[in-house]
Structure formats: C-alpha cells, structure tokens
Amino acid sequence: MAKADSEYDFIFLSVRHGFVKEAVETLRKNNIKGTLVFFCNFWNTRKEVQEWAGDYDYILAFPTAGGHMQEDHLDGVLFDHLMLEGEQKAHISNYADLTALLVSADLKWEVPHDMVEWIWIHMAINAGVTSTAARSGNLENPEELALNLMNSSSELSLAIKAIREALKVVEARGVNLKLYKAELLPYKIPAWIAGKAMKVMFAKNELTRKIMTLHNDKQDIFYCCQSV
C-alpha cells in the first residue's frame, strides 16, 4: 500500500466506472507524488482530464485487459500490449523511463492518433457489445451473457450493428473516424460475415474469450453504456 507523503516514478490509475477524479484527489490529499498514468475508461474531454490532474504530470494509456474485483481479490487477464499516448502529446519529462519500464515487463505498445478519442471509440465498442449481450438474459449473470454472445454468430452480427450506431455518437463529438481505420476495420465489413468471423475468433482465442467473461463488473458496464 502506498503511504502518505511518498513519491513514485509512475502511479498507474486503473479505477472503476468514472472514479478517476476521486482517485486523483485521494493521492493529492495524501501528498503522494509521481507521474500519473491514467489507465482506464472515461467519457470526458482532454480539458477535463487536465483539470483532474492539476499540478500532476500525466499521460494517457489503456491496457488490453479484462477483469473484476471480488471483495479484495482481482480476477483478470492482461495481454502483452497496450495503447499509449505519443510523446509529443504527453508532455512528460520521463516518457523514455516509462517505455523502458514497459520493455522490461515484456509489454509492447501502440500509439493512436489521439488517446482521448481512442478511449471514446473503445467505450462505444464496449457499449455496443454489452448492450447486445444484455438482450439475451439476466443482468445478474454477466459472464453467462458474454458466453451466449460469443457462441452466437447472429448475436455477434447484431453487436456489430450496435457498435456502428454507437460510433456515430463518437463521430458527433467531432472525431474523424477515418484516422482510426485499423481499429474500426472489423466493423466495416458486412455484419453477417463479421459475426461468423468473431465467433470463430472467440472460439480459438482463449485470452480474448477470457477478457469477455471476466469483464463483468455491472457498474462499470452501466457507466460505459450510459455515457455513450
């Protein structure tokens, strides 16, 4: 546990459903210092993120991961790559130290056109997937809903269509989706083909399947869907 009046090279903030601001305030009140790495979803603007950070140096990043807390136990899975804001936009003096840390942990990273916009897009995709999954059962068992979705090409096709609708919300915020062609390519092909391809992918890729079943924090899911 971090102690009050302590200092770190980096502080990774990966908190649930919109509590980033509160997490930063907790650090500030306890005089815990270090470069903040915002490592989670948010539906806020860059200006708002800057206001959260205040006098902290910060950078935006996002893990390819899934999981949930059960009491004091974290059950999750983390891929070997993540999304990371480019050095030009981050404006932190220890960017090289951060990338060296990632290399030492055998983690690779990609730099999107804009990290805030990428997170909005990620939230829209999540909202499309989870809202489709919720159609088929009881919200008290998110893991079962995820399994039902991954095992049905027709439901996955509906998820593709829902994602397309959710992405229109992101576009309405002024995001040029053409700058994210690689990320959005799977959602451009005919929905029925994409649904079949995704079913095969989920069947063969154990880690991706694990992310879907472990990402079952209802409040986090609601935050994502309600924000979009």
Show which residues each predicted segment covers.
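Rossmann-like NAD(P)(H) cofactor-binding subdomain of soluble oxidoreductases
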Residues: M1-D75
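Short, surface-exposed alpha-helical recognition segments that flank or form part
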Residues: V15, S154, N216-Q219
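Soluble or luminal CAZymes and related metallo-dependent hydrolases
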Residues: F19, N41, A90-N94, L158, ...
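Short Gly/charged-rich anion-binding patches and loops
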Residues: E22, N44, D97, E165, ...
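Rossmann-fold dinucleotide-binding core
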Residues: T45-G128
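Helix-loop-beta segment of a Rossmann-like dinucleotide-binding subdomain
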Residues: H73-G86, S136-L149, K204-H215
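Active-site-lining helix/loop region of Rossmann-like oxidoreductase modules
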Residues: A100-K181
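NAD(P)-dependent Rossmann-like dehydrogenase/reductase catalytic/cofactor-binding core
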Residues: I160-V228
